[in-house]
């Protein structure tokens, strides 16, 4: 049983009889001497799909839910359903667009290292690698000699993700992106 301060994004907890996956954590420190940090967590109910906001003290003990992570790749999109195929036993996992709306911006058919989070045999979310490689679909033309400057410009990836990239990056370039911070890391190695 970890403390609330030890829980990370993507962790599944058992809270009030429901299995919830942590989507986002905001830490705040109240004014005054008394009390420790507060952790406001945006949680996703794996059964109903509803979003729940809860606040925990840093010392609150939370119960982890029983979950497994299965390595998988995006196989195809069927309307608002994304179908991932297990890399070991080829089991298909269907996830709704709403359940993985943030994560799907980093995933295409070539993305390696994606894990489907499975609770009680049902897929409930995605666990992304720390970085992914995507192709720049649209950006302003690159400027010759711009690699020495620190200016950036907006770019849209093939998945629809929008990030800032250095001026020397052009349309069609393959780049590495940090999935936690939504930031450009560098050109992908060929």
Swiss-Prot record:
Domain of life per record: Bacteria
Record GO terms (molecular function): translation elongation factor activity
GO biological process, one term: peptide biosynthetic process
InterPro entries: Elong-fact-P_C (IPR015365), NA-bd_OB-fold (IPR012340), Rib_uL2_dom2 (IPR014722), Transl_elong_fac_P/YeiP (IPR020599), Transl_elong_KOW-like (IPR013185), Transl_elong_p-like_YeiP (IPR011897), Transl_elong_P/YeiP_cen (IPR001059), Transl_elong_P/YeiP_CS (IPR013852)
Pfam families listed in its UniProt record: EFP, EFP_N, Elong-fact-P_C
Any single GO CC term annotated in Swiss-Prot or TrEMBL for this entry: cytoplasm
Entry's family note: Belongs to the elongation factor P family.
PANTHER family xref list: ELONGATION FACTOR P (PTHR30053), TRANSLATION ELONGATION FACTOR KOW-LIKE DOMAIN-CONTAINING PROTEIN (PTHR30053:SF14)
Protein name, entry field: Elongation factor P-like protein
